[in-house]
Amino acid sequence: MTHVRPVEIFHLGPIPIYSTVVNTWIIMILLLAGIFLATRKLSFIPRGAQHVLEMFLEFFYGLLEEIIGKEGRRYLPLVATLFIFILSLNLSWFIPGMKPPTMDLSTTAAFAVTTIILVQIFGIRKLGLRGYIRHFFQPAPFLFPLNVIEELVKPVSLSLRLFGNLFGEEMVVTILFLMIPFLLPTPIMLLGVLMGTIQAFVFTLLTITYIANFVHGH
């Protein structure tokens, strides 16, 4: 079983750089290269990777429109990037010797904190500063402390959910291999892909609902 604690690789001055960070950099480079190759020859009639990419974007555009409304399209870059990046990190165990960075709590916490900060910025831009503050007094003024606490707890909930589910998945897979050593690896790999996809989608869907909460002003 993989250790939860990341391995220290090197230092940038006094700052230690851990395996989680290096693995994340590798995935980012691979993603950028893949997107460049998929979009370098765009055509009016999409084919191959371009077709898959457009179908993916259309799916999330439809989801945003369904939950937020017509103005949901402006949040498509954030939502699509979140899903692709988290999914790629979740499935990075396909690369020999690489541990998924999302199995490190610091990675999931960084995703969660960044996402919630962006949601607050979207809320202020949509409602204005007064409307943003007033939002915390809804539906009744005495709920202000609870609404503030709820907002502060969101990054904790997001980060622990993603980390815990992925760590639990690894535990289940390890136990299955120990109990049934002759089990074919293909079903286990498919289970890992399914779980990684579900967790990336859940994180993205929660982000959309948080944005919708501010956009709709309730």
UniProtKB/Swiss-Prot annotation:
Which family, according to the similarity comment? Belongs to the ATPase A chain family.
Looking at the UniProt entry, the stretches that span the membrane are: 17-37, 75-95, 104-124, 162-184, 196-216
Protein name, entry field: ATP synthase subunit a
Could you cite one Gene Ontology molecular function of this protein?
proton-transporting ATP synthase activity, rotational mechanism
Q: Which SUPFAM superfamilies match?
A: F1F0 ATP synthase subunit A
Q: Which residues form a coiled coil?
A: none
Query: Sorted alphabetically, which Gene3D superfamilies does this protein's record hold?
Result: ATP synthase, F0 complex, subunit A (1.20.120.220)
Which keywords has UniProt assigned to this entry? ATP synthesis, Cell membrane, CF(0), Hydrogen ion transport, Ion transport, Membrane, Transmembrane, Transmembrane helix, Transport
What this protein is reported to do is described as: Key component of the proton channel; it plays a direct role in the translocation of protons across the membrane.
The alphabetized list of GO BP terms reads: proton motive force-driven plasma membrane ATP synthesis
Tell me any Pfam family this protein matches: ATP-synt_A
Q: What is annotated about its quaternary structure and interactions?
A: F-type ATPases have 2 components, CF(1) - the catalytic core - and CF(0) - the membrane proton channel. CF(1) has five subunits: alpha(3), beta(3), gamma(1), delta(1), epsilon(1). CF(0) has three main subunits: a(1), b(2) and c(9-12). The alpha and beta chains form an alternating ring which encloses part of the gamma chain. CF(1) is attached to CF(0) by a central stalk formed by the gamma and epsilon chains, while a peripheral stalk is formed by the delta and b chains.
Q: Name one GO cellular component term.
A: proton-transporting ATP synthase complex
Domain of life of the source: Bacteria
Per its UniProt record, what InterPro entries does this chain match? ATP_syn_F0_a_bact/chloroplast, ATP_synth_F0_asu, ATP_synth_F0_asu_AS, F0_ATP_A_sf
Which organism's genome codes for this protein? Moorella thermoacetica (strain ATCC 39073 / JCM 9320)
Please report the record's description of how this protein sits within the membrane. Multi-pass membrane protein
